[in-house]
A protein has these predicted regions:
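Fungal secretory targeting signals
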Residues: 1-25
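Conserved beta-strand elements of beta-rich interaction domains across eukaryotes
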Residues: 12-14, 70-72, 119
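Generic low-complexity segments that are intrinsically disordered, proline-rich and/or Lys/Arg-biased
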Residues: 14, 27, 42, 136, ...
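Immediate post-signal-peptide N-termini of secreted proteins
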Residues: 17-38, 180-181
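Short, surface-exposed loop motifs enriched in S/T, G, D/E and P with embedded aromatic residues
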Residues: 24-25, 76-78, 170, 175
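Short, surface-exposed binding/anchoring microloops in extracellular/periplasmic proteins
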Residues: 31-89
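Acidic, low-complexity intrinsically disordered segments
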Residues: 89-181
Length: 181
């Protein structure tokens, strides 16, 4: 009996968070979820983040990582390098597409923001976007064999996340902006 009570008490914060998340949704999204026409994401994983940096990790010249969302079954790889083109040009922070175009990302100040298109409309395009941010602590190994945590080396560096699997939650859902052509 005590184990069941402990389990219920441990699950209460997660249940309350999900209830608050659903309660804060616009009416039309809540209606889609109620009819099973839309699967809202809850959590995501950033996997195997690696990067190259010419300044020891202060800025990243290129990086790649995996994105996994079990709730929507989206599993894709993401890459940024010198040939990457932003998928938006509307004055917002530039975002870049993963291999699965439903997922975009922004690297800023040591964090990755992931944006996942959800609730496809009649045209097949996502009507809404869920977004969440995860800090990505990195360690860089410089060309001279030195190791620097979060960007203190000065030689060309290979960098990787301190964790191979970074868990994060989506915290926002908004109407999808018009597509950039």
């Amino acid at each position: 009996m005590n184990q069941l009570l402990c389990l219920l008490l441990a699950a209460t914060p997660a249940a309350n968070a999900m209830a608050a998340y659903i309660a804060s949704l616009p009416q039309e999204i809540a209606a889609l979820v109620a009819t099973d026409d839309c699967q809202l994401p809850d959590e995501f994983s950033i996997q195997n983040f690696v990067a190259d940096s010419a300044d020891g990790g202060k800025t990243l010249d290129s990086y790649e990582f995996g994105f996994l969302d079990d709730s929507t079954t989206v599993d894709t790889s993401c890459l940024f390098n010198s040939t990457s083109k932003a998928v938006n040009n509307d004055g917002r922070t530039p975002r870049y597409s993963c291999n699965d175009a439903r997922v975009n990302f922004i690297w800023q100040n040591g964090s990755l923001t992931l944006i996942e298109g959800v609730c496809a409309g009649e045209d097949g395009a996502a009507d809404y976007e869920a977004s969440g941010t995860a800090p990505v602590a990195i360690t860089c190994t410089g060309g001279n064999g030195t190791t620097a945590n979060n960007a203190t080396a000065t030689a060309a560096s290979n960098c990787k996340a301190d964790s191979a699997d970074i868990q994060a939650k989506f915290f926002s859902i908004q109407p999808a902006p018009p597509k950039f052509e």
